[in-house]
């Protein structure tokens, strides 16, 4: 059995890609997209029809050019998501504009709009996850959306404080970023030789997984942002893992036994009182890596969102 099939015995495998053809190849349960992945996919000629449709929609649904571009961007994200859902049996994650990461109300508004666009294409909201950055405002937006039956995927998650606040808000799923945590520590104190058990990104997800299971939180833990297959194999047993096509390929090509590494702890504990905003901000601020990586992640997604807008504006 290849490693990818081995992992699938214990973990739901999700494709981290906007490239519909590569998703088709690996038979994942779900797929996740983000502005960077959409920008990459939008540059491929086989998806031109999805872009043309989004442009036509933008022209029809915006008075100013700025409004048309925003409308086209939203439609493009949904077009890709709807195509992906023809292939995967589960859900697709679609991201709210990263520039709204500190605006709870506008994040809620954008999420509802994306769900509405999906429903106009005949996609039920039970097949959509709305991706929001794990800021205090993003978590509060998700808390409200969950009450409306709109499930959320809280992304750019780097600190334990973020993970705890998400669980306490009752969000559907979190995406702790293994690779970006690893990058930060590797740049400061390179691990040589590499020992996966000591990988700070792997340890972070393991801690969150154990904490959630010990306190009976139902929020799904989906490890994300991997740099190497060792990280993925070390988290086999995690609820879900979202994996880029290049790493899915490596796992599919290697035949070796896969052992479950994450197992729910037998000991359980009562849940603590929910964190206040002040506690959350303080705890998160104590983690220099998380502060830096959350800020950087929001900025990078915003840059790619703007590039996507420029690409569409040129076609309007």
UniProtKB/Swiss-Prot annotation:
Q: For this protein, what is the EC number?
A: 2.2.1.2
Localisation:
Cytoplasm
GO terms assigned for molecular function = transaldolase activity
CDD domains linked to this entry: Transaldolase_TalAB
| Chief localisation class | cytoplasm
One cellular component GO annotation, for this chain's record?
A: cytosol
Pfam families xrefs:
TAL_FSA (PF00923)
Per its UniProt record, what Gene3D superfamilies does this chain match?
Answer: Aldolase class I
What reaction(s) does this enzyme catalyze? D-sedoheptulose 7-phosphate + D-glyceraldehyde 3-phosphate = D-erythrose 4-phosphate + beta-D-fructose 6-phosphate
What sections of the sequence does the record tag as coiled-coil?
none
* Active site: residue positions: 131 (schiff-base intermediate with substrate)
Task: Kindly tell me the pathway this chain contributes to.
Answer: Carbohydrate degradation; pentose phosphate pathway; D-glyceraldehyde 3-phosphate and beta-D-fructose 6-phosphate from D-ribose 5-phosphate and D-xylulose 5-phosphate (non-oxidative stage): step 2/3
Alphabetical GO biological process terms: carbohydrate metabolic process; pentose-phosphate shunt, non-oxidative branch
Recite the UniProt keywords alphabetically: Cytoplasm, Pentose shunt, Schiff base, Transferase
Report the family membership. Belongs to the transaldolase family. Type 1 subfamily.
HAMAP family (UniProt xref): Transaldolase_1
Q: How does it assemble?
A: Homodimer.
What does it do?
A: Transaldolase is important for the balance of metabolites in the pentose-phosphate pathway.
Q: What is this protein called?
A: Transaldolase A
In its UniProt entry, the species of origin is given as: Escherichia coli (strain K12)
The coding gene here is talA
């Amino acid at each position: 059995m290849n490693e990818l099939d081995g992992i699938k015995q214990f973990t739901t495998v999700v494709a981290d890609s906007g490239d519909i053809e590569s998703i088709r190849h690996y038979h994942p349960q779900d797929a996740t997209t983000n502005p960077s992945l959409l920008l990459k996919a939008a540059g491929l000629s086989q998806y031109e029809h999805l872009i043309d449709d989004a442009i036509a929609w933008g022209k029809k649904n915006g008075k100013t050019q700025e409004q048309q571009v925003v409308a086209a961007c939203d439609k493009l994200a949904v077009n890709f998501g709807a195509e992906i859902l023809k292939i995967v049996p589960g859900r697709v994650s679609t991201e709210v504009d990263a520039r709204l990461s500190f605006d709870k109300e506008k994040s809620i508004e954008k999420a509802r709009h994306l769900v509405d666009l999906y429903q106009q294409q005949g996609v039920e909201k039970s097949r959509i996850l709305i991706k929001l950055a794990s800021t205090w405002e993003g978590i509060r937006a998700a808390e409200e959306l969950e009450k409306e039956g709109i499930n959320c995927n809280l992304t750019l998650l780097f600190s334990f404080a973020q993970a705890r606040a998400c669980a306490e808000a009752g969000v559907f799923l979190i995406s702790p970023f293994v690779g970006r945590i690893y990058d930060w520590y590797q740049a400061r104190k390179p691990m040589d030789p590499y020992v996966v058990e000591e990988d700070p990104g792997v340890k972070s997800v393991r801690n969150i997984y154990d904490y959630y299971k010990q306190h009976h939180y139902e929020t799904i833990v989906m490890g994300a942002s991997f740099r190497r297959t060792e990280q993925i194999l070390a988290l086999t047993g995690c609820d879900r893992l979202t994996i880029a096509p290049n790493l899915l390929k490596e796992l599919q090509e290697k035949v070796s036994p896969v052992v479950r590494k994450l197992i729910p702890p037998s000991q359980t504990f009562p849940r603590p009182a929910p964190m206040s905003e002040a506690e959350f901000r303080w705890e998160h601020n104590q983690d220099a890596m998380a502060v830096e990586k959350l800020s950087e992640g929001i900025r990078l997604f915003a840059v790619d969102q703007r590039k996507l807008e420029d690409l569409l504006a040129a076609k309007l």
